[in-house]
Amino acid sequence: MNTKMVTLPIEYSDKNVTAHGGLSLLKRFIDKIGIIEALDGFDFPKPGSNRGYDPSEIILSFWLGIWTGASRYIHSDWVRYDKVLQEIFGLKLMPSQSTYSRFLNKFSQKKNNEIFPSLQDWFFQKLDIGKITVDFDSMVITRYGDQEGSAKGYNPNKKGRNSHHPLLAFISQTRIVANAWLRPGNTAASSNCVEFMKETFNQCLSSKDVGLVRETKGFTLKR
């Protein structure tokens, strides 16, 4: 089979270009739902100096790294050189990997409890899906190495391995996680189930009309 070679023109330009122009659609989306303005209303950890980035800028920049394929902090650095993408999202400068790690390390369990249930509720207010079905479940996640918070406990698939034993709440209609608590692997299935359900209904889903609740055995053992 003969293949005809096509001569493609090569041109040079002094204009900035990006391989991620399609993300402009995401920019329109976040502008439409007003999520950046909503983030400004939450008490996120503040920078250590007046020259630091606003929390909403750090979060938006972190999203850009994830949307362009980053799976490690260091990968987010490539977005710092994409001036077109920064212009699309209205960012004058972008944080370094150390800024992300410092910001995320400031979150404590107390701070998480103050912010994320209310943030989840804000998100679910945007979903017009009528009455919802909420599924509660717990699962075992096997961990390898020395993962923070992991411990040896009930693990039917990898006996003797460290694990986490999280509690999860899902919206059945959308398959979206409504709430999640990460627990050590040596935690009993029913531990903190009632408190978890209260937070889910009273905070994360306070604006939704719940029509049906389904639970696994671990949740029913507590009552």
Regions found by a protein language model. Give the residues of each.
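Dynamic "connector" segments at or just before major functional cores
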Residues: 1-209
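Acidic/histidine-rich, metal-coordinating catalytic segments
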Residues: 137, 209-220
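A short acidic (Asp/Glu
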Residues: 145, 221-223
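Alpha-helix N-cap/loop-to-helix initiation residues
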Residues: 189, 220-221
